[in-house]
Amino acid sequence: MSDAGLVIDTHVWLWLEAEPDRLGEPARARIEQAARAGKLWVSVMSVWEIGMLVAKDRIRLSMPVDEWVRQASATPGMQMLGVIPEIALESTRLPDAPHGDPVDRLLMASARLHNLTLVTADEKILAYAQQGHLKALKA
């Protein structure tokens, strides 16, 4: 595992909290290892994305979104990763980026700038990582 740790995609965070069996065993093991080391990151953009998905009635949580975020982000070893100007700019400069989705671009930029491995099931991001643009792990 990278010394810098892991950043998890929004859907991975949702799965981790509600459907952990959807995660492959290698991803689950790496997430647990990163959490024990205090190197498990969730982007604040994932908080925003979950809030938007709830507001648009595209997902339902088992509790109000504010409470869900509070509880889910209290996972031992998990830290919130903010969006700093360098990440925002990097997201506009991703070489051959596979996504126009702003949250995915910000997650990829965060992983690149902080030398993190992005845990995702997004096939476009995984293929992008295989091209050497960032480190990724299949969820």
Locate predicted features.
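Acidic, PIN/NYN-like endoribonuclease modules and their adjacent C-terminal/linker elements
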Residues: 1, 108-139
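Short, well-structured N-terminal submotif of metal-dependent ribonuclease cores
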Residues: 1-42, 56-70, 123, 137-139
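Alpha-helix capping/helix-boundary segments
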Residues: 12, 46, 87, 107, ...
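Short active-site oxyanion
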Residues: 37-40, 58, 77-79, 113-117
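Acidic catalytic patch
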Residues: 69-96
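Donor nucleotide-sugar recognition loop
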Residues: 97-103
